[in-house]
Amino acid sequence: MKRGIRHFPRLWRASRLARRWYYARAGAYPDWRSLIEPEAELWQSARAGAQGGPRVLMATAIGSYAHAATLESALSAALTFRGAEVHALLCDGSMTACAECDASLYPDLSRFAEHGPSQDLCRNCFSPAESVYRQLGITVHKFSEWLGPDDRAEARRIANTTPANEIQAYTLDGLVIGEHAYAGTLRFFATGALDDEPMAEPILRRYFESALRVAFATRRLLKSIQFSSAVFTHGIYVPWGIVGEVARQEGVHVSTWNVAYRKRRFIFSHNDTYHHTLMSEPREHWEDVELS
């Protein structure tokens, strides 16, 4: 059935959006409240004991990544029991494009070039993940809280005036911005090159503007609140690649993760992404491990 629907782009889009709407309301996210209630006193004691401990930022960012909100909220609970003061970072509609967007959702690409995800994907993104973290009593930071009007204007100015052929190599104060914006655009089109993609330039500029916004907001957050570590998925694209760039520059330890190739396992990489650490990890760390 899925293959059949894909032959009808507008029907495919409608089914995807309907599925997102349903999952945001029906069981795709953990119900921490029901887990905490039987041991409420224990959890409150753990939370109180964690205040003032090492601060860890769960930069989930994209709330509709239910699997990310699930794992990162579980890590939040585990770290709280171990004395860490955990905060979360979510986008509340501030990004102009992100890793949740892809061309198959937009049969009319000009619509995305003009509006981005603001008229559809953003509607069911922030609230479910915020609810997950609020159930745990974790402080939730929104991109909009750390992004001022001047930041938005500057991001728009840079994105509109930088020559298209210079975007990929663009850096800001030593931060690799353009590379992640370009990678995000490639991901949007599910391609290895943008040369033959319709609307490639305006969509690249939209990802570029979004990357700049994420950089401005994340930098202000990390300069205002001292975090010892930041945890998030992938470590590339927009927003996670940009969050990683800023965190490393600000001296915050970065831990990225992705779903592993073995069932019910995850790959964690420190201060880099699994794309690199899978190639550079010393073989002696695993070659003699007895696998079940």
Predicted features by range, described:
Residues 61-71, 232:
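A short, glycine/small-residue-rich beta-strand->loop->alpha-helix junction that serves as a flexible
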Residues 214-269:
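Conserved nucleotide-sugar donor-interacting segment of glycosyltransferase catalytic cores
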Residues 1-55, 59, 78, 82-212, ...:
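Conserved N-terminal ligand/cofactor-binding loop architecture of enzyme catalytic domains
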Residues 67-68, 72-73, 238-241:
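Short, well-ordered alpha-helical microsegments
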